[in-house]
Amino acid sequence: MQKAVVMDEQAIRRALTRIAHEIIERNKGIDGCVLVGIKTRGIYLARRLAERIEQIEGASVPVGELDITLYRDDLTVKTDDHEPLVKGTNVPFPVTERNVILVDDVLFTGRTVRAAMDAVMDLGRPARIQLAVLVDRGHRELPIRADFVGKNVPTSRSELIVVELSEVDGIDQVSIHEK
């Protein structure tokens, strides 16, 4: 049951524009930076951030796609043969000595981000890993903090944050739902 819309299309657009500016400022430009979106919605957010960064800086930043299914400690498994579901990683550039900015839709327990960091480290040794999220809802189980946050949305554990993006869902909005 949906309780409230906490970000509409305009709020998401403004948050991503602000995050793009913060990424550029904190990294003193975009030289050596790469964006890696965490499947599924993190990929679309990473692409949108790359577009905004290019509009601001006049230079493109590479975007990769990361599937962290095999790195999760709470794997999603198929019921028939108990094989982990793998969707595929596509990071077509080296990450070694690069500033890797992981992009995800919601930061909750930190487990997805930990798995994403493991996956990135398997690809090489980045100079630094930063984290950009559209929504930080709290309730961390691991010592992980986002470097760039679109909106902090305090929630109870009985609530869900639902991020809908036009590329997948036909609408841009973030809402809170009861479990």
Swiss-Prot record:
Substrate binds at residues 40-41, 104-112, 137. One of its GO terms (molecular function) is uracil phosphoribosyltransferase activity. It is an enzyme of class 2 (transferase). Disulfide bonds: none annotated. Coiled coil: none annotated. Its EC number is 2.4.2.9. One of its GO terms (biological process) is DNA-templated transcription termination. It catalyses: UMP + diphosphate = 5-phospho-alpha-D-ribose 1-diphosphate + uracil. CDD domains: PRTases_typeI. Keywords: Glycosyltransferase, RNA-binding, Transcription, Transcription regulation, Transcription termination, Transferase. It comes from the Bacteria. Gene3D superfamilies: 3.40.50.2020. InterPro entries: PRibTrfase_dom, PRTase-like, PyrR, PyrR_bifunctional. A motif (PRPP-binding) lies at residues 100-112. Belongs to the purine/pyrimidine phosphoribosyltransferase family. PyrR subfamily. Regulates transcriptional attenuation of the pyrimidine nucleotide (pyr) operon by binding in a uridine-dependent manner to specific sites on pyr mRNA. This disrupts an antiterminator hairpin in the RNA and favors formation of a downstream transcription terminator, leading to a reduced expression of downstream genes. Also displays a weak uracil phosphoribosyltransferase activity which is not physiologically significant. Homodimer and homohexamer; in equilibrium. This is Bifunctional protein PyrR. It comes from Bacillus caldolyticus. The gene is pyrR.
